């Protein structure tokens, strides 16, 4: 009777909604249903999955693969067609994309992917593709989410994911390491990474003498160009070509060693890289600000925090040390984000720093304008910190102050916003050499804009400065 009742409840429930980005593999798709993720498989996929299940279970234990279990039989009736097996997974709190990761984060994901490939190969399995979107982060720890891309290894098979790995991991990393160009805008514009053919055009003659660059990027790009420019090219049957297992392993190991050694020029001072040391705050004022954040977290007890303009994460750590369980930081400075990511790795805190240009947040895009969801669809928290943030939009980029306030208050139902007046040295620097057109930029206008969107529950003037911290609770 209990099973019949459960079956009726399931039948009456809303149909599962396919995750918009899950459409490329017809053998299995991913659905969002209530508070979980469901993954369907056809019979062929179910057989392959069963063969790898023991290996996958060990990866779950190691924290390298999202957990899975068989969905209750009653859930099968929610799907049409020949579904052989349905898995359920815990719902990830946050989905992030490679064009939001820092250089350090993308590098960690690349090394994670390669190590996973190497370990699977030792056990007779491999990954069927190399998309970076199959990696997600819990704090700074990468984890794998696509169970059906773990396949039995066939002796001598080619690595069909090589081009994808290079364009979604290697080339974006080289773009920064070689040319000090960040990957974010290029990657987001293309979605599938940075094309090798485009990267090759940036290389000088001396780069052609690099064996690794030539073998992994230059030669494949030239061969691809040759194939597309000729109407008929006899390349032979790819099924007849073989890549011995030892050669496959050596290729993966070479890439791992190469990427491990990639670095950025930390000697190039970026706009906010030295902010923590060179801002207009005194140590006492900074401590006062941290104490205010600590008191806010202790009183309101937010489980999750979004830190806008996080820099290297100081105030995210204050929140985590005072009761918050998870913090996601956003900044547009690449050096600060790399330092923040490395700090998260070293401390093992649940803190993930991500790239965000708040003037132009990640949009919903891709197939049907839904394949990759936008910032506002994916990121929300119990509380938001917007410390030394609003003036960068309102003054540096001419975004109306009221709109800045409205945007920040939509990120979380409560939080702290710091107002930085024109008299502050930082704003004075921003206005130096340009006309001051911001007649309505003042604390009265800020407070009025905030009161239209939320209730101000506390305000605090930082001693020795003209900056004011506002605690708000959004009006629902």
What is the meaning of each model-derived region?
Residues 341-378:
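S-adenosyl-L-methionine
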Residues 126, 131-177:
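Catalytic activation segment of kinase domains across protein kinase-like and atypical kinase folds
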Residues 302-311:
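Conserved class I S-adenosyl-L-methionine
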Residues 312-324:
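Conserved SAM-binding loop of SAM-dependent methyltransferases across substrates and taxa
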Residues 384-385:
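A conserved beta-strand element that flanks and buttresses the S-adenosyl-L-methionine
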Residues 392-408:
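A short, conserved alpha-helix within the catalytic core of class I
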Residues 407, 411-421:
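Conserved beta-strand signature within the Rossmann-like core of class I S-adenosyl-L-methionine
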Residues 326-331:
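Conserved SAM-binding motif I beta-strand of class I
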């Amino acid at each position: 009777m209990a099973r019949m009742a459960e079956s009726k409840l399931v039948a009456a429930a809303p149909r599962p909604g396919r995750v918009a980005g899950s459409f490329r593999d017809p053998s299995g798709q991913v659905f969002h249903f209530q508070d979980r993720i469901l993954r369907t498989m056809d019979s062929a996929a179910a057989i392959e999955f069963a063969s790898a299940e023991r290996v996958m279970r060990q990866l779950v234990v190691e924290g390298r693969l999202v957990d899975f279990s068989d969905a209750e039989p009653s859930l099968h009736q929610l799907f049409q067609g020949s579904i052989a097996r349905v898995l359920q997974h815990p719902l990830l709190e946050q989905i992030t994309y490679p064009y939001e990761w820092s250089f350090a984060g993308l590098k960690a994901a690349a090394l994670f992917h390669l190590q996973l490939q190497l370990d699977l190969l030792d056990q007779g399995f491999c990954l069927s593709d190399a998309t970076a979107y199959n990696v997600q982060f819990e704090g700074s720890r990468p984890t794998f989410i696509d169970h059906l891309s773990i396949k039995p290894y066939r002796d001598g098979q080619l690595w069909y994911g090589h081009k994808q790995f290079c364009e979604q991991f290697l080339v974006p990393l080289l773009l920064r390491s070689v040319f000090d160009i960040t990957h974010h805008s290029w990657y987001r514009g293309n979605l599938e990474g940075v094309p090798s053919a485009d990267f090759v055009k940036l290389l000088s003659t001396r780069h052609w003498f690099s064996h690794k660059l030539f073998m992994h990027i230059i030669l494949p790009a030239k061969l691809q160009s040759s194939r597309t420019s000729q109407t008929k090219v006899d390349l032979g049957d790819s099924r007849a070509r073989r890549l011995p297992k030892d050669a496959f392993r050596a290729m993966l190991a070479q890439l791992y060693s190469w990427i491990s050694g990639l670095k950025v020029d930390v000697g190039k001072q970026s706009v906010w890289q030295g902010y923590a040391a060179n801002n207009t705050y005194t140590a006492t004022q900074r401590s006062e600000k941290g104490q205010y954040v600590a008191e806010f977290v202790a009183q309101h007890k937010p489980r999750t925090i979004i830190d806008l303009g996080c820099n290297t994460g100081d105030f995210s750590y204050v929140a985590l040390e005072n009761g918050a369980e998870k913090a996601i930081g956003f900044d547009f400075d690449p050096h600060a984000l790399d330092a923040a990511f490395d700090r998260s790795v070293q401390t093992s805190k649940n803190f993930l720093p991500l790239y965000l240009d708040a003037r132009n947040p990640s949009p919903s895009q891709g197939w049907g304008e839904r394949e990759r969801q936008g910032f506002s669809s994916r990121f929300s928290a119990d509380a938001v910190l917007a410390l030394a943030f609003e003036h960068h939009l309102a003054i540096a980029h001419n975004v109306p102050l009221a709109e800045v306030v409205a945007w920040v208050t939509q990120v979380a139902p409560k939080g702290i916003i710091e107002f930085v007046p024109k008299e502050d040295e930082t704003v004075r620097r921003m206005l130096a050499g340009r006309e001051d057109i911001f007649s309505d930029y003042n604390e009265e206008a800020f407070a009025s804009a905030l009161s239209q969107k939320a209730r101000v529950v506390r305000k605090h003037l930082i001693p020795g400065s003209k900056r004011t911290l506002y605690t708000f609770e959004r009006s629902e």
